[in-house]
């Protein structure tokens, strides 16, 4: 019988605890994919956890459905914690600690400004991209046709160039809200544009040619052999100038925070390599642990993934696999190949997570109770699951993603075709 999340918080915790007891016939804890198809435990497909205000739509099918509402916005574009969230206000960090990485910065004034989220292409034609190695956080998610796309969040570090910049998706109604960030992107489909226009991000936290924000905030760099849509670039510094003009270039006041620790937490199991097969041979994210640097090195489909600005391979202190409900909507993104429908990735409520750090993986769950809360991470018993101080890459995956289990320290995650 499929395991399903229940409707209230206590029952949800009970369900997660039950699922944590289910294991592979190998060493990988089944909560690696509390919802996923595990080869030894059978298919476990929970429904998404409801928020306090509505029930999420069912797991995605290939039949488009009307889009579900995003979590209720705050009253204004300025994030404000709800009374319920007030009890969760974290102990303030020292003013020189980056809340998105847990690292101290040399100049604390770099944190007295707004984070900037930028949409970056992952089409093979644009690789290597520019600027991803400088981001605090990078989210990778399905766009359509199996191709993935990135939303990179920059805070203290401002690379000189980021791109190529591409169009936004429904997930970009969520990520800028989580991190109180200005969002820079090239535009969007008509349906996504309307969702953005009616969100609490608009207009102050939105920067796109779609809404009349062109040069000097975005600029073209024509490159031989590259299509026009792959030539748009920007950088966080110039977008912050726009934020300054709008009066929003301020240090965020986050109502909840992630937990960081240099000490390796308990409960991990060894793994020195894993991959996520979004689109095998094209968008396969591969991560190998380097014990000398104590970081995960990223490759794409067998080729080291480098930053065009430095020529260096992209690395991460943490790689976080966030499993969430993926729902096709009635928003059409394009018409090629018979057409593709926009995917709503429901990163609200809570769901399963696997955190890779220090050559180990740690299963647990993620939580986001309010719209302007960032994702936070916990063991099955509700104890905070700390990240390693440093940058993080977040791989967003459907609930019914399959896993190979651990074989010789390696794991393969295979999401359904989308």
Where are these regions (language model features)?
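Compositionally biased, intrinsically disordered low-complexity segments enriched in Pro/Arg/Gln/His
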Residues: 2-6
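Generic short N-terminal amphipathic or hydrophobic helices
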Residues: 15, 32-33, 52
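Sec-dependent bacterial lipoprotein signal peptides
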Residues: 20-39
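Ser/Thr-rich, Proline-interspersed low-complexity disordered segments
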Residues: 41-96, 107-108
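A surface/extracellular/periplasmic glyco- and lipid-processing/surface-interacting theme
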Residues: 80, 87-135, 144-418
